[in-house]
């Protein structure tokens, strides 16, 4: 059974959305486990703030890269479909 571009694209999008949702859930769990700020020393408070920023930045960078890779794979898949079509139905 041949996979269409639309099926391939939709599957990549679904996987990306699912992965993003799971990553957001993990981040939410981490942030929920943070101690009450009133119990933290100024140094630890600063440490947590830096760590939270780092997690958010890395999450954004990772999601951007995943999106770029997905778009690249979609483009390559479309090219392969065109090559397959050209091989099956060569111009005369």
Curated annotation (Swiss-Prot):
<keyword id="KW-0282">Flagellum</keyword>
<keyword id="KW-0966">Cell projection</keyword>
<dbReference type="GO" id="GO:0005737">
    <property type="term" value="C:cytoplasm"/>
</dbReference>
<dbReference type="Pfam" id="PF03037">
    <property type="entry name" value="KMP11"/>
</dbReference>
<dbReference type="GO" id="GO:0007010">
    <property type="term" value="P:cytoskeleton organization"/>
</dbReference>
<keyword id="KW-0493">Microtubule</keyword>
<dbReference type="GO" id="GO:0008284">
    <property type="term" value="P:positive regulation of cell population proliferation"/>
</dbReference>
<dbReference type="GO" id="GO:0031514">
    <property type="term" value="C:motile cilium"/>
</dbReference>
<comment type="similarity">
    <text>Belongs to the KMP-11 family.</text>
</comment>
<keyword id="KW-0969">Cilium</keyword>
<keyword id="KW-0206">Cytoskeleton</keyword>
<keyword id="KW-0106">Calcium</keyword>
<dbReference type="InterPro" id="IPR004132">
    <property type="entry name" value="KMP11"/>
</dbReference>
<dbReference type="GO" id="GO:0006952">
    <property type="term" value="P:defense response"/>
</dbReference>
<dbReference type="GO" id="GO:0015630">
    <property type="term" value="C:microtubule cytoskeleton"/>
</dbReference>
<keyword id="KW-0963">Cytoplasm</keyword>
<protein>
    <recommendedName>
        <fullName>Kinetoplastid membrane protein 11B</fullName>
    </recommendedName>
</protein>
<comment type="subunit">
    <text>Monomer.</text>
</comment>
<comment type="function">
    <text>May be involved in the regulation of the cytoskeleton through interaction with the subpellicular microtubules. May be involved in parasite mobility and attachment to the surface of the host cell. Behaves as a strong immunogen during infection.</text>
</comment>
<dbReference type="GO" id="GO:0005874">
    <property type="term" value="C:microtubule"/>
</dbReference>
